Amino acid sequence: MSEPRKILVTSALPYANGSIHLGHMLEYIQTDMWVRFQKHRGNQCIYVCADDAHGSAIMLRAEKEGITPEQLIANVKAEHSADFADFLVEFDNFHSTHSDENRELSSMIYKRLRDAGHIATRSVTQYFDPEKKMFLADRFIKGTCPKCAAEDQYGDNCEKCGATYAPTDLKDPKSAISGATPVLKDSKHFFFDLPAFDAMLKSWTRSGTLQDAVANKIAEWLDSGLQQWDISRDAPYFGFEIPDEPGKYFYVWLDAPIGYMASFKNLCARRPDLDFDAYWGKGATTELYHFIGKDIVNFHALFWPAMLEGAELRTPTGINVHGYLTVNGQKMSKSRGTFIKARTYLDHLPPEYLRYYYASKLGRGVDDLDLNLEDFVQKVNSDLIGKVVNIASRCAGFIHKGNAGVMVEANAAPELTDAFLTAAPSIADAYEARDFARAMRETMALADRANAYIAEKAPWALAKQEGRQDEVQAVCALGINLFRQLVIFLKPVLPNLAADAEKFLNVEPLTWEDHKTLLANHQLNPFSALMTRIDPVKVEAMATASKEDLTATDSSADTAPAGNGELAKDPLSAEIDFDAFAAIDLRVALILKAEHVEGADKLLRLTLDIGDEQRNVFSGIKSAYPNPSELEGRLTMMIANLKPRKMRFGISQGMVMAAGPGGEEIYLLSPDSGARPGQRIK
């Protein structure tokens, strides 16, 4: 037998500023299943994580709540830890980036980069809040859009017209924190020389460390040229002060990934068998894997490996990227009851049902995963209760009643047990490749065969026939052995079911290797229900509990519309005459391509077909469409005669039309079926 592998695994660090929701849980469940599989196979697999506990947002929320940042992150960590534990996510260590280990390692890495010439400084001009005595990030500045005059817009992008601009272009700027008028000030910032690692990154990202789709996206960024990365923030800031630079702090994304190392170092202090340098030192032969979402690929596939390389540390063996979660085919929505917190789910349903559903849908790619609540109920009830647990419930009673709970030594269908045995390597390969969906399909196919065998032999009918009790015992003993095999294959996904099954089977904790043997002349414990069907009423109750309160009344002035409708929130604009309207050329447009804009928080770049020509349009709809490829092939409406506007990212040749207040609530408009690209909208 080969030596056990030594593997260190991490998930992205949850931000210590809010609750965990089911979108977050997708990643932690995915990672936990892979880690449990490795341990199931006998490998030494360590799973560490931490709360991402630094940044202005945490500092400001703590101030608003009248507590210290340290109190806030301690409260959030307790909440996160409970959610993870109750979802059966089993970390070897869950730490915090606000720790002595992280301070020490962040300083060490920074000094190594600085001493190697990879840190530069230059002056940056930013808005400064004179009341709060702090520099303002773009999201903390609001004012009037310089393009369309919409009020209350962010410092870099207008959510109403989609325009982008520098914060200094904003009219009547105000601090979103204090309401004060900001002033421009210069400040020394520190930059990591990312372009110096261009050749290294081009090689590393094509060395098998990334999925092909991710490597291709990274190649686009590399081909467009890397920029120096600003790694500093000015006081006041909740984080670590940069060594030898009073009043200057590490940007949260500098010390956040170092939190992986810090959590492991904290564990090493309690585990003498673990050697920190064996996992993080240059040339380490152990394996290191990061599981992340596709929204933070640039930090993990560009900045992080470059930092490690520059600091003379090892780089990851692999970065495993997953897609976003949708619910019922749409982005999670509070108003629809599909923005579901982890705790809200746990208040209504067992964790293993969601673990199995995620496993049944998770492939090895970066495609988004949809949690369809009707399909969720059907799949769990059909697969787990109707197939897997059903085998044990069908057979256990006959063994207890007819043979005092002792399984006879008999293999009533060798070809069936051989099929289970020969399927194991393929299921293991699927787990290893993170193709959980294939592992579940192949396991359920075996469950179907086991159920078909039991249905064919019908022990309930045999038991009524004189002299056929030995057959009943042989059939049911085989059924229990096949159930045991299925539990072994499902244990990384369903650890509680496995533990309950082990008690019923009266066996030690099952390992993967146990699939090669059968129980014979073995005493079972009394059987009790291992799982119950999902009642759709509980799913409905969960959705109801997730809905935000939409019944608040509006207290606007008498001239405002009554109630809390859209006109109350966004009153009608001043009237225009028909000629003004007729001057607007509205056209049907086909979205040929939709993609993220590097460096822009809110923009998507759309390539539009309007009949005889193509247009390039930048639109501030990214928050509502985080997976822009979903828009490709869709018809929309655009203002085609809007004067082209030069933007920081290129020329925008028009404006697409959308409704909604902004953020996640943006809805791109589409014409009725039958409309063709280029047709005028009248």
Swiss-Prot record:
Q: Does the record bear Metal-binding in its keywords? A: yes
Q: Which Pfam families match?
A: Anticodon_3, tRNA-synt_1g, tRNA_bind
Motif 'KMSKS' region: where in chain: 331-335
| Highest rank taxon of the organism | Bacteria
Q: Which PROSITE patterns match?
A: AA_TRNA_LIGASE_I, TRBD
EC number(s) recorded for this UniProt protein:
6.1.1.10
SUPFAM superfamilies tied to this protein: Anticodon-binding domain of a subclass of class I aminoacyl-tRNA synthetases (SSF47323), Methionyl-tRNA synthetase (MetRS), Zn-domain (SSF57770), Nucleic acid-binding proteins (SSF50249), Nucleotidylyl transferase (SSF52374)
Binding-site residues, ATP: 334
List, separated by semicolons, the cofactors it needs: Zn(2+)
Biological process, per Gene Ontology = methionyl-tRNA aminoacylation
One Gene Ontology cellular component annotation held by this UniProt entry = cytosol
Which is an annotated GO molecular function term of this record?
A: methionine-tRNA ligase activity
What does the record give as the reaction this protein catalyses?
tRNA(Met) + L-methionine + ATP = L-methionyl-tRNA(Met) + AMP + diphosphate
Give the chief site where it resides: cytoplasm
Residue span, tRNA-binding domain: 580-682
Does the entry annotate any disulfide bonds, and if so which pairs? Answer: none
Signal peptide residues on this chain, from the entry's feature table: none
Which key words tag this protein in UniProt?
A: Aminoacyl-tRNA synthetase, ATP-binding, Cytoplasm, Ligase, Metal-binding, Nucleotide-binding, Protein biosynthesis, RNA-binding, tRNA-binding, Zinc
What is the residue range of the motif 'HIGH' region?
A: 14-24
Subunit-structure text: Homodimer.
Function in brief: Is required not only for elongation of protein synthesis but also for the initiation of all mRNA translation through initiator tRNA(fMet) aminoacylation.
Entry's family note:
Belongs to the class-I aminoacyl-tRNA synthetase family. MetG type 1 subfamily.
Give the protein's recorded name: Methionine--tRNA ligase
Q: Which organism is it from?
A: Pseudomonas syringae pv. syringae (strain B728a)
Recall the taxonomic lineage recorded for the source organism.
Answer: Bacteria, Pseudomonadati, Pseudomonadota, Gammaproteobacteria, Pseudomonadales
